[in-house]
Amino acid sequence: MSRRHKAEKREINPDPKFGDLVVTKFMNAIMLDGKKSVAENIVYGAFDAVQGKSKQEPLSVFHSALDNIAPHVEVRSRRVGGATYQVPVDVRPERRQALAIRWLIAAARKRNETTMIDRLSGELLDASNNRGSAVKKREDTHKMADANRAFSHYRW
């Protein structure tokens, strides 16, 4: 880690359809090999599919899904006198959002539907209803932190 300069945060533009920065971050995370237009088609197609399946506003479904996936606490490894403890720590808001996006995409990629649009829309709907493997990942993270609450005094 550099001691001289802190890396500057890059300015990102909101997406053209909804004007939302979180959707842009989501698109950038979906994108593979710099193919932004493909990522846009996937995200907007999934949003259209969500609207078709649930008759709800896709942006509100997306934000509620992210809120249901985002972890509040996680465990970090801390070495104390030859033993490594899993210490529960609170998650910063930026990291909460990043983890939620990452877990949502990973869960969507693991699903069995044929196209990524179907997988993503299904996972978004499941997550907004507190179901699905991304929400399970959040629950597992919280259980791990709860099980290691005894080591919370090793926080830094």
UniProtKB/Swiss-Prot annotation:
CDD domains: uS7_Bacteria
A Gene Ontology cellular-component term: small ribosomal subunit
SUPFAM superfamilies hit by this protein: Ribosomal protein S7
Keyword Ribonucleoprotein in record: yes
UniProt entry tagged with the keyword Ribonucleoprotein: yes
Pfam families the record matches: Ribosomal_S7
Gene Ontology BP terms: translation
GO molecular function, one term: structural constituent of ribosome
Alphabetized UniProt keyword annotations: Ribonucleoprotein, Ribosomal protein, RNA-binding, rRNA-binding, tRNA-binding
Top-level taxon of origin: Bacteria
Role summary: One of the primary rRNA binding proteins, it binds directly to 16S rRNA where it nucleates assembly of the head domain of the 30S subunit. Is located at the subunit interface close to the decoding center, probably blocks exit of the E-site tRNA.
Family: Belongs to the universal ribosomal protein uS7 family.
Assembly with partners or alone: Part of the 30S ribosomal subunit. Contacts proteins S9 and S11.
Protein name stated in the entry: Small ribosomal subunit protein uS7
Organism: Rhizobium etli (strain ATCC 51251 / DSM 11541 / JCM 21823 / NBRC 15573 / CFN 42)
